[in-house]
Amino acid sequence: VVEAVTRLARLGGWRVGVGVGDVDRPLATHAREASGPAFFAARRAVEDARGAPGAVAVRGPADGRAVRRADAAVVLLASLLGRRSAAGWEATGLVDRGLTGAAAAGALGISPSAVSQRLRAAGAEEGARAAALATDLLGDADR
């Protein structure tokens, strides 16, 4: 889920609704045919994402404390990522794939200090921490 939110934040222009909870089985062939508390929550979340910070919302069958916390973490992550520049995405993408700052600098044709500046401006460390937090809190909300 966090990976999908990250990819859609990078693309921009999307409203993202995340539903937590159970789904009816067997799973439907098409999402429109699916049902269960998670699907109903996701549909509500997509509507709630309209005008929400980061254009994202997390909802559950009962929007209790765990769901509200997961929502807050995902909103913070999407808001941070939505402010990231193309240069920031480029630098974080290389480092996320395991390149060192020096190797990323070589790939980008810039200095290592310029890579460091891009990573700071992109909130790379904050984004990684927010993604980990969102993952944990979404897991808690889905229990």
Predicted regions and their residues:
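Regulatory and interdomain segments flanking nucleotide-handling catalytic cores
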Residues: 1-143
